[in-house]
């Protein structure tokens, strides 16, 4: 089945790409989660609109990515969350929490889908995360999780 990706999907492509996937994968996973829409002849207009929107928000060059990387690595990110007595969090820290903490700390605005936690953050203390700015540039961000 031909689909148009509306979001970046690991292993398939970026938003605006037209890809061919198995019917079940499209119907049961991609389309219900709004990662893709069905390809139609009229969908070509949607592809151009998605590509234009992506171009505005995307970091275009490696130089831009390196500038954002320098800004990110210079920011001290501190995240206050509720926790129990043993230092375990109620829930976990999400990429959206990290993105808002980076912005609150004076860093650049980062898309939550670009933040890779590795494993869920469920304890207090210092943690390392990676932000994928460009296919060739990753920024390491250290986050200090403290009790609220």
UniProtKB/Swiss-Prot annotation:
List the top taxonomic levels of the source: Bacteria, Bacillati, Actinomycetota, Actinomycetes, Kitasatosporales
Protein's UniProt name? Large ribosomal subunit protein bL9
The family note in this entry says: Belongs to the bacterial ribosomal protein bL9 family.
Molecular function terms, GO-annotated: rRNA binding; structural constituent of ribosome
> RNA-binding: is it a keyword of this entry?
yes
Q: Which SUPFAM superfamilies match?
A: L9 N-domain-like, Ribosomal protein L9 C-domain
GO cellular component terms, alphabetically, are: cytosolic large ribosomal subunit
InterPro entries hit by this protein: Ribosomal_bL9, Ribosomal_bL9/RNase_H1_N, Ribosomal_bL9_bac/chp, Ribosomal_bL9_C, Ribosomal_bL9_C_sf, Ribosomal_bL9_N, Ribosomal_bL9_N_sf
């Amino acid at each position: 089945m031909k689909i148009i990706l509306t979001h970046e999907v690991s292993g398939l492509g970026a938003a605006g790409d037209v890809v061919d996937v198995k019917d079940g994968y499209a119907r049961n996973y991609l389309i219900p989660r709004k990662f893709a829409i069905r390809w139609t002849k009229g969908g070509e207009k949607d592809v151009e609109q998605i590509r234009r929107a992506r171009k505005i928000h995307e970091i275009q060059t490696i130089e831009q990515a390196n500038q954002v990387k320098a800004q990110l690595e210079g920011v001290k990110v501190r995240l206050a969350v509720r926790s129990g007595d043993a230092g375990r969090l109620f829930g976990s820290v999400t990429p959206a929490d990290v993105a808002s903490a980076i912005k609150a700390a004076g860093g650049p605005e980062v898309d939550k889908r670009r933040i890779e936690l590795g494993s869920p953050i469920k304890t207090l203390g210092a943690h390392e995360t990676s932000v994928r700015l460009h296919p060739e540039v990753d920024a390491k961000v250290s986050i200090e999780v403290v009790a609220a």
